[in-house]
Structures are given as C-alpha cells and as structure tokens.
Amino acid sequence: MKIETLEIAGINSALAALRLPFNKEPRSIFNFNLESNDKNYITSYSSATISDDDLILLKTLIKRGDEHAKVVRGIVVWVKITAPIYFFTEEETYRAGHERLSSQSTMHGVAKGLSGEELVKVKSELPMGVELTKVDFFSYQCLRNIVKQRHNHRLPEWHKFVDWIKTLPFAKELIFVGLEELYE
C-alpha cells in the first residue's frame, strides 16, 4: 500500500469561519495569494499563524462532536492511494467528507479491448487483492471518524492509513484531539 499526500487546503477558510457563529473575527493571521503568470503556470501560496485562542476553541468544538466542529469539514486533504480493491471497498463506508476524484480503470487496464460477456467475465473474476491507484479527498472531520473507527482494525491497511493521518499538519490538534492515546 502506498499513500502520497498531494495537497492540503482549507485551513485559512476554516479559521475565517471559526468564530462566525459567535459574531466575532478570527484571532489567527492568515494569507492566501494566487498568481497566474501565463496560461500554463499557477503559483499559490497560503500561510496561517493559528492563535492559541483559536486553537483552544477548535479543540473544544472538535471534542464536543461533529455538529459543533463544522469548520474542520473545510480542511481537506487530497491523497493518492495505491491499495488492494478490498481496502477501497471498505473505504467507501466513509461518504461524508470523502470523495473520489479519479481512479485507475480496469476497463482500460486488465479488460482493455474486451466487451460483452468476455468483459463481464474478466471483471467479475478480478481478485480483491488486485491493487489500484485512486485519488481521493478527505476532510479532517472524516479522517477523525476513520481514526476512531479503524485504529484497531484487523486489516493492516487501516493501520497504515491511520499512520499516514498522523503525518498531516495539525493532526494531533485537529484530528486526534481527545484521542491522544491513539496518536502515540
């Protein structure tokens, strides 16, 4: 199994939204800059200095539950995963805060050029252990639910996935808060 973080976004937006329910301004400092120098080149730059007060509020809301921690739905990670079909079948359990952008196609790979019954036969006989590569995105809120529900799973792929989650920025503070024993 291979897991590669492609992009992380939404931290600034989450900070901007954090105190809206309280009719207050964020206490953190954040910047976003996007430049397009020509038709094929884009540079984006994002930075955030999360204030202690905002971090305390984030942790408090996350510990209170998903309905209070809405802003962490906006922090999104795009990831490239190469794993067996059986892992992706289980991963589909997580629909809220998880989407598939694209995946390797068995139609254009092992079943290329086939059609009709021949195609159906080859696809129906694919072993569950065949590895495919997919690009998905997950919200931090979804990743927190995965940690809670899969940290002790029998499949080793889930342990690798949880270990990858630990590598994300602010994972300890925004995903594992209240679950610190699972972070070690």
Predicted features by range, described:
Residues M1-E184:
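Family-specific signature for flavin-dependent thymidylate synthase
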